[in-house]
A protein has these predicted regions:
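Short, cationic low-complexity segments
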Residues: 140, 178-193
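Domain-exit/linker segments immediately C-terminal to small folded modules
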Residues: 149, 171-184
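Short, charged/polar, Gly/Pro-enriched secondary-structure boundary elements
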Residues: 118-121, 168-175
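C-terminal edge-of-domain segments
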Residues: 152, 158-168
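Short, hydrophobic/π-rich interface segment
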Residues: 97-157
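An N-terminal assembly and electron-transfer interface module characteristic of large anaerobic redox
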Residues: 7, 136, 169-171
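Amphipathic interaction/junction segments at domain boundaries or subunit interfaces
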Residues: 9-13, 17-124
Length: 193
């Protein structure tokens, strides 16, 4: 958005908007000429390292199999949810995080997004084939803090992106398997016995 703002300041509102539109069209043409993408596995590794590497360090002292750490991550989810909802009032296109009460029975922290700017961008710019690379990284990130993510969908393949986080040794973690859906998203499916 900085570039668009700069164009408007330099060339005026109308001309700045025209230039921004031309830039976007040119960029779209450029994307059509890009060579084939590398294998998904290679891209997944890159995206995961880029966005989730902090979880490796965090996992050295944070362990979701400890009740205090589960309580703490729930508090973090609650605070982030409060912050997101305040931002949502000011910036309606941002993440909309809905915190859920801590599940004391199952020792599970839950929240969900009803809106994700990454998913909206991917839909608008026909980049849905890339979106799973970002969404799927969450599983790896949570595993680095000795947890398991149980997710039924994301804003890319469902009406919400749900997070149910439990310790990796929690019996609930063993009730699910992670599968890849037809669009490339990792999702949790309850095991049938």
């Amino acid at each position: 958005m900085f570039r668009k703002k700069w164009l408007k300041a330099r060339y005026g509102e109308e001309e700045g908007n025209k230039l921004w539109e031309l830039i976007n069209r040119q960029y779209d043409k450029y994307l059509e000429d890009l060579p084939d993408y590398p294998p998904v596995e290679e891209l997944q590794e890159l995206v995961t390292k880029l966005f989730m590497s902090g979880f490796v360090k965090l996992g050295k002292f944070f362990n979701l199999n400890r009740s205090f750490d589960m309580w703490l991550i729930n508090k973090v989810f609650q605070k982030i949810g409060e912050k997101d909802r305040k931002l949502y009032a000011q910036y309606p296109a941002c993440f909309c995080n809905i915190s859920e009460p801590y599940d004391k029975k199952n020792h599970a922290a839950r929240y969900h997004f009803t809106q994700c700017p990454n998913a909206e961008f991917a839909k608008k710019h026909t980049l849905m084939h890339v979106l799973p690379l970002f969404c799927n990284s969450d599983y790896w990130g949570i595993s680095q803090i000795h947890g398991t993510l149980i997710r039924h969908g994301t804003c890319g393949n469902s009406d919400k992106c749900d997070y149910c986080v439990v310790g990796s040794e929690n019996p609930m973690a063993k009730e699910y398997e992670i599968i890849k859906d037809e669009d490339g998203f990792l999702v949790s499916r309850k095991l049938e016995y």
